[in-house]
Regions:
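A short glycine-rich, Lys/Arg-flanked "PGG" loop and its adjoining helix->strand segment in the class I
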Residues: 80-95
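Class I SAM-dependent methyltransferase SAM/SAH-binding core
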Residues: 3-56
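A short SAM/SAH-binding and catalytic strip from SAM-dependent methyltransferases
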Residues: 65-78
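Helix-to-beta-strand junctions that scaffold the AdoMet/dcAdoMet cofactor pocket
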Residues: 16-17, 76-77, 90-92
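Short, glycine-/aromatic-enriched active-site segment of Class I SAM-dependent methyltransferases
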Residues: 102-122
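Short alpha-helix
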Residues: 124-139, 145
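C-terminal lobe and adjacent flexible extensions of AdoMet/dcAdoMet transferase-like proteins
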Residues: 138-198
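A short acidic, Gly/Pro-enriched loop at the edge of an enzyme's catalytic core
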Residues: 55-66
């Protein structure tokens, strides 16, 4: 989900081999075109590039074994809906792997208007526990935090590093599984489907 030019998708395509299939979903036509070119250049015919959003994945229910998303959820407006969609397309027993930006507390309103903060993935992120809670609420089990990384330490922007420190923004790796007995995502309660960053 949010495949961009395809780094993760191409690695997955090599891992699953020619008998496996990788669906690479991205919203941006330019990124999809780059991914198609990169897959062709790598000789990987098992990558299918899909147009769409994380909140409405154009795949059938219970159709994939695993979903990865790397640095994307922080940019998705309705994170709970995106997680419910991921749950829907996973087969029972399927795995979710997330690498994204998490916070210790919400970003102050004055920073949310700064394009640099959006570009650096700070202002769209939520608290780590909220990610974990959303994953559990849609039905995932074995939800766990794997590791943390100080992603912003190498930012070229002093202001970004300052804001990241202020809100303890960091990269986190999470994983979860769809229960073997699962059939559909738990409904997202009205009023909680869209996260309020106000």
């Amino acid at each position: 989900v949010g495949s961009g030019s395809g780094t993760d998708a191409l690695i997955c395509a090599r891992l699953v081999g020619p008998r496996g299939r990788v669906y690479a979903l991205d919203l941006t036509p330019g990124m999809r075109a780059k991914l198609e070119a990169n897959a062709a250049a790598a000789g990987l015919a098992n990558v299918e590039v899909l147009a769409g959003e994380a909140e409405s994945i154009p795949l059938a229910d219970a159709s994939v074994d695993a979903v990865t998303t790397n640095g994307v959820l922080n940019l998705v407006p309705d994170k709970a809906r995106a997680l419910a969609e991921i749950f829907r397309v996973l087969k029972p027993g399927g795995r979710l792997q997330i690498a994204d930006i998490a916070l210790a507390r919400q970003v102050a309103k004055r920073y949310r208007q700064d394009p640099q903060m959006w570009a650096e993935c700070v202002v769209g992120a939520v608290e780590e526990e909220r990610y974990l809670d959303m994953m559990r609420k849609v039905g995932f089990e074995n939800v766990e935090r794997l590791r943390e990384l100080d992603y912003f330490a190498l930012s070229s922007s002093d202001r970004t590093r300052e804001v990241a420190r202020l809100f303890n923004a960091h990269s986190v790796a999470l994983r979860a599984a769809k229960p073997l007995t699962a059939t559909a995502a738990a409904p997202v309660p009205l009023g909680r489907a869209v996260l309020d960053f106000g």
